[in-house]
């Protein structure tokens, strides 16, 4: 930006909550001049802190930005069951009986929760916001609505499920896998798929 206090124009797509890890985060920046995507990735990783690695860089057209194509619409997560709340490193397998309980939980006509907003608190049916899920041996997979129109956090889903089965105090750990937006056909795709790599001759 310009003015008396110039700074980088940058933002994060759906910033990650405290206590979560992630395999797929997105940073949106404006550049003053073109740069080759591979070179940009190499230069960023050379000065990055431990635990943060830039994987790729793509350019998104102004048309897609202007039409709202880059607005996030979904995220998917892994939910791990912990031995205790003291460490996220010691995990245990998902109980086999949870699979049947989860199917019963999702088969409800509605899944009503009290959801807080900045101004109020209201009862919301979160079932339509759960786009997909699967109980695996090592973790629970969740595919949830994310963004300005609808936003469902994985901890709210799991808190509601654990209350449903009477195990509210179960310690869990969350890892986000990726963030998605809708393409021109309305299909959910990773944000990266909306752009193209930059190649400078």
Where are these regions (language model features)?
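Short, charge-patterned binding micro-sites
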Residues: 2-32, 65
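Core RNA-modification/binding signature centered on pseudouridine synthases
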Residues: 4-5, 104-201
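Short amphipathic beta-strand starts and helix->beta connectors
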Residues: 6-15, 57-66, 119-132
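Ordered, amphipathic secondary-structure segments that act as subunit-interaction surfaces
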Residues: 23-78
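Terminal, regulation- and interaction-focused segments at domain boundaries
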Residues: 27-30, 72-94, 98
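Helix N-cap motif at beta-to-alpha junctions
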Residues: 32-37, 84-87, 147
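Short amphipathic alpha-helices in soluble, non-transmembrane regions
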Residues: 39-48, 90-108, 157-158
């Amino acid at each position: 930006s310009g003015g008396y206090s110039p700074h980088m124009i940058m933002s994060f797509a759906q910033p990650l909550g405290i206590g979560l890890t992630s395999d797929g985060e997105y940073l949106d920046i404006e550049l003053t001049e073109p740069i080759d995507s591979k070179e940009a990735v190499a230069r960023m990783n050379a000065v990055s802190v431990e635990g943060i690695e830039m994987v790729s860089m793509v350019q998104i057209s102004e048309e897609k930005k202007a039409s709202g194509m880059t607005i996030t619409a979904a995220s998917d997560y892994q939910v791990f069951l912990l031995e205790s709340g003291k460490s996220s490193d010691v995990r245990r397998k998902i109980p086999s009986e949870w699979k049947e309980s989860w199917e019963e939980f999702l088969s409800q006509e509605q899944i009503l929760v009290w959801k807080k907003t900045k101004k109020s608190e209201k009862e919301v049916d979160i079932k339509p916001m759960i786009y997909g899920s699967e109980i695996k041996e090592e973790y629970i997979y969740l595919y949830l609505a994310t963004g300005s129109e609808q936003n469902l956090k994985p901890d709210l889903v799991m808190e509601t499920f654990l209350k449903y089965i009477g195990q509210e105090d179960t310690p869990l750990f969350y890892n986000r896998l990726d963030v998605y937006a809708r393409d021109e056909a309305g299909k959910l795709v990773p944000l990266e798929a909306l752009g193209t790599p930059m190649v400078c001759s």
